[in-house]
Design a protein with these regions (language model features):
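Amphipathic alpha-helical interaction segments
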Residues: 1-215
Length: 215
């Protein structure tokens, strides 16, 4: 929730004549803004990437910094079309399993290591859960706040999961914090794009349906 408020506030400040669009109003409308904008537009915008990186750094506290997050977003922008082509192959059940193992700590039977792919999937699912629980049926006005929230949440949660796994001595060999964050935003992008093409009600219902598996 703190992250959603931060993004909403930063987005509100960036708009002219935004006096009536306070942080609470923007927060409630994040889902609507997400649906009314091309997610690629955020990645194409240096200003949006910078705001997203800064908000993610604030949300992650000592776990991450804006330079690292900005680098990850730049890489995602360069690879966004190839990542998008993989959207239909993304495994929701696998991501939910990783979420339960590394976030909820419920799945103790599996022996999956804390690799970039596993932690990234878990972080993306946590981001979707937080995004849906923090959004409502408010404003449907256009803007980049929604996209920034989804990508930023994935990055901040990825950085936290890596540090937690490292503290427990469970990080797989060769796994770095940046590689986890890269996987987290890639999973988030794939899930969003897949949700846009599944069902007749659009991306929001798709993300809500995905979150319903563990909410």
């Amino acid at each position: 929730m703190d992250f959603l408020k931060t993004v909403a506030s930063e987005y509100s400040k960036s708009q002219q004549g935004s006096g009536s669009n306070d942080a609470q109003h923007q927060q409630s409308g994040l889902s609507g803004m997400l649906l009314n904008n091309n997610l690629f537009d955020v990645l194409d915008s240096d200003a949006d990437k910078k705001k997203t990186a800064e908000a993610a750094a604030q949300a992650s506290g000592s776990h991450g910094n804006s330079d690292m997050f900005h680098n990850v977003l730049n890489k995602l922008n360069q690879n966004k079309h190839s990542v998008a082509q993989e959207k239909d192959n993304v495994d929701e059940d696998f991501a939910v399993k990783m979420f339960k193992k590394f976030v909820e700590k419920k799945d103790t039977s599996s022996d999956e290591k804390a690799s970039s792919n596993n932690l990234g999937a878990a972080a993306a699912m946590q981001a979707i859960k937080m995004f849906n629980s923090g959004s409502g049926s408010g404003s449907s006005s256009s803007g980049s706040g929604g996209q920034a929230a989804l990508l930023g949440l994935a990055m901040s949660e990825g950085s936290k999961l890596f540090d937690n796994a490292q503290a427990e001595g469970k990080v797989a060999k060769g796994t770095t914090k940046e590689s986890v964050i890269e996987q987290a935003v890639q999973f988030a992008l794939k899930f969003f794009l897949k949700s846009q093409t599944s069902g007749s009600s659009g991306g929001n219902s798709g993300l809500m349906g995905l979150a319903a598996k563990f909410l």
